[in-house]
Regions:
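Residues in the recognition helix of alpha-helical DNA-binding motifs
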Residues: 15, 29, 40, 68
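Short alpha-helical "recognition helix" segments of helix-turn-helix
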Residues: 25-27
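Residues within the alpha-helical elements of helix-turn-helix
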Residues: 18, 29, 57
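A short, Lys/Arg-rich alpha-helix, primarily the initiator
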Residues: 1-22
Length: 72
């Protein structure tokens, strides 16, 4: 069994960029500090509760990237 590698932070940043949203906007919505959002952008893993909050705020299923990785 191998570790599932999903560049989740980059994926979150990409969605924000596509929508013209900022780290400050996301930090206000989650809520958490803006500095923490920038740390998230550089991570390859994330707490599931935090990821769920991000999914809800952005209305985007980031969990699907892990499911796709498991199928490959």
């Amino acid at each position: 069994m191998h570790a599932i590698m999903v560049p989740i932070g980059k994926l979150i940043k990409d969605i924000l960029d596509e929508r013209g949203l900022t780290a400050t906007w996301l930090a206000d919505k989650i809520p958490c500090g803006r500095a923490n959002i920038y740390k998230i952008f550089n991570k390859n893993s994330i707490d599931t509760e935090l990821l769920l909050r991000i999914c809800i705020v952005l209305e985007h299923d980031f969990f699907k990237y892990y499911s796709q990785e498991m199928k490959e």
